[in-house]
Amino acid sequence: MNELLATVAPGGAVLDLGCGAGTFLPDGASFAVVRVDLEPPGVHVANFVQADAAQLPFPASHFDAVFSNHSLEHFHDLAGALEEIGRVVKSSGSLYVSVPDSSTLTDWLYRWLARGGGHVNRFTSARDLASIIERTTKLKHVATRPLCTSFSFLNRRNRRARPPRRLWLFGGGTQTSLLLATYILRLLDRFLGTRLSFYGWALYFGNAPDRIDDGCWTNVCIRCGSGHPSDRLLRVLRFPPAYRCPACGTLNLFTDDKQ
């Protein structure tokens, strides 16, 4: 999503929709960020507005960019939410959407462990979803990037409440178990052509840079879930190949995107 953030002019306005405590950090940003969610995040969040995505309390054409990062699958009124996004974003603005593919192992695990996990909308085709969003928001679809999993939602360090008993079937959510699981799935995908580490898609609409990296980033942090292209990572170990996440510093096993 950093590609679209870079297009926002100084003094602009950005909407982080369905974000909880926030899906990105506007460090050093020269634009304003408004965070919106149906439920309060439980911690202080600057410029937080509690609202329904299908009834946004903002004037038309107010935002230069809208980010819906893993939130469309949670909206009960998906059509209404998309119409509202189209209303509040400028015609010259941009939109970033990321969603899970409900046919993947990762989304199945998420819904099984979390007893649905709030996923009321299921998506199985990036092309179909892009067409719906483009038609509703009037923003042109410019790129789609496949997303890999890190199982960060299984990480016991990310849980405040007691983890479900089912989690012990997957190593208890320890970082060691997640390191091994993600690395093995990446290798199976590479050598056997499976889709076990595939998670979903990131879709870009509207005013986007001329070149968006639409390749699959296989290095996704097991703690914070942020993805990074392999050619921008500094390996700290040769065997096993490993890097530290630039966002949170967690040690992850490294895979080459181009292999």
Task: Please give the residue ranges for each predicted region.
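A short SAM/SAH-binding and catalytic strip from SAM-dependent methyltransferases
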Residues: A65-D77
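Glycine-/small-residue-rich active-site loops that bind phosphorylated ligands and cofactors
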Residues: A54-Q55, E73, R87
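Short glycine-centered segments of the SAM/dcSAM-binding site in methyltransferase folds
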Residues: A13, S92-S94
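Conserved N-terminal segment of class I S-adenosyl-L-methionine
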Residues: M1-P59, A65-S68, L82, F198-W201, ...
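Helix-to-beta-strand junctions that scaffold the AdoMet/dcAdoMet cofactor pocket
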Residues: A9, F75-H76, V89-S91
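S-adenosyl-L-methionine-dependent methyltransferase catalytic module, highlighting the catalytic core
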Residues: H76-G80, E84, S94-Y243, T250
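Short acidic capping loops at alpha-helix termini that bridge into adjacent secondary structure
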Residues: S61-H62, S92
